[in-house]
Amino acid sequence: MSDPIARVGALADRYTPDVVTFLREMIAIPSESAGEREVIARARAEMGRLGFDEVKVDGLGNLLGRVGSGPLVVAIDGHIDTVGVGDPSTWTRDPYRGEVADGVIYGRGASDQEGGIAAAVYGAHIAREAGLLDGVQVWVTATVMEEDCDGLCWQYILREGVLKPDVVVITEPTNLGVYRGHRGRMEMEVRTQGRSAHGSMPERGVNAVYKMAPIVADIERLNQRLGERPDAFLGAGTVAISQIRSP
């Protein structure tokens, strides 16, 4: 079969049952942020079974598997941690069963993002089997703690020199769309300082909540203004308050 797309398609069809089994077994393992050890072990075993050229776990706990040895370094990334399931009784299907119905796999992580990892592991394997890795090394990275500490996993990989790819493909769910960019992201903490006083004599103190109130209103107005000036490629920026706390 000379057409590379046809070769990949045929191999994908052949490996579909294995991909489904692999994904269902990952879904069956609870893997919230900072609790990924068991699911990392399962993914590592799959890479080993498929004969990846190199498989390792870095100091943070990220799993990295390589196929090919060319000079061009391509990373295909997916975070292997998930958010929690909340109240399991509110689910219409068992979040840890990986139920298959009408060609769809249901469960925590099926879409975000263990499905992407299953596709990446087998995609790299298929690319090698189809003879498409001439001059290329592909690293599949199953990264940890993305849900709680977005960016920490790749910050570690780059700062510690674990891997320095030329190209990165991210397997976040996009309904199979190809996205060529993403808005930047920042986390900021704003503090206001008060002075305590008895509730019957508030004039003797400084209320830090009152000092925060206009800041909250300003942030809400900023989000409205950002929506009025969308970028032609990336769309509108957003800003949101996600947490307020008093020590």
Tell where the protein language model's regions lie, with residue ranges.
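Acidic/His- and Gly-rich active-site-bordering loop/insert found
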Residues: 2-108, 129-134
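Acidic/histidine-rich catalytic neighborhood of metal-dependent amide-processing enzymes
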Residues: 113-183, 187
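Midchain, well-structured core segments that form catalytic/ion-binding scaffolds
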Residues: 155-247
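Glycine/serine-rich anion-binding loops at beta->alpha junctions
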Residues: 103-119, 198
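Structural motif
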Residues: 72-75, 103-104, 139, 166-169, ...
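Short glycine/serine- and small hydrophobic-enriched flexible loop segments
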Residues: 25, 122-129, 214-220
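Fold-independent oxyanion-binding glycine-rich loops
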Residues: 60, 78-80, 102, 110, ...
